[in-house]
Design a protein with these regions (language model features):
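Hydrophobic, aromatic-enriched interface-forming segments
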Residues: 29-74
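Alpha-helical scaffold segments that mediate packing/assembly in large oligomeric complexes
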Residues: 1-45, 174-183
Length: 183
């Protein structure tokens, strides 16, 4: 969620898909042209052509599988890492829980669902050298079975802190699905 722009800006563009309309959702499907628009947006920002990562939502993966033979051939190349492959200069991954965006291109808050017409998951691309991740402390919680007379079970749980964010929000692009209600 933190790697996606809040809204469209010059340094973090939010683009919309341009494909054909899905009759069930009124969502415009992602096309290869849209992928190239993401690449062009990063090129325009001066982002180096190496270390570009693209995270596709499941809707956009399905759209591309329907239409693009090259994408279909590269899909699921490495089942161990989840990496789809490299296409158009991107290391491509798939993630089912990308943020929702409104039809106006504004990111919804963490936990908000796409419950309004025109709210869809996004796909996003970023330059890996402009993001960081930090893993914090891990704490283990444990209680012995003697303290659980009802079920006589040992309980174990963990708390782990982790963060992933932009160092500087100037090398990312978001693609959200366009919306076209039936006329």
């Amino acid at each position: 969620h933190a790697l996606c722009a809040q809204k469209n800006t010059a340094k973090t563009p939010v683009l919309t898909t341009t494909g054909e309309r899905d009759a069930a959702t009124d969502r415009l499907k992602m096309t290869v042209k849209d992928l190239l628009a993401m690449k062009a947006a990063l090129d325009k920002l001066g982002v180096p052509t190496t270390n570009r990562r693209l995270v596709l939502c499941t809707d956009h993966v399905n759209d591309l599988l329907e239409t693009d033979q090259r994408f279909k051939e590269q899909y699921n190349i490495d089942r161990n890492t989840g990496k789809v492959g490299k296409l158009y200069g991107f290391d491509i991954y798939e993630f089912a829980n990308t943020p929702y965006y409104t039809s106006n291109g504004v990111k919804k808050a963490v936990g908000d669902k796409g419950d309004t017409a025109g709210d869809f998951h996004c796909s996003f691309a970023f330059y890996t050298q402009r993001v960081f991740k930090a893993t914090g402390s891990t704490k283990m919680y444990w209680s012995p079975a003697e303290n659980d007379p009802e079920y006589q079970r040992n309980k174990v749980n963990f708390r782990h802190y982790f963060i992933c964010m932009f160092k500087k929000a100037d090398a990312g692009v978001v693609m959200t699905s366009g919306y076209k209600a039936e006329a």
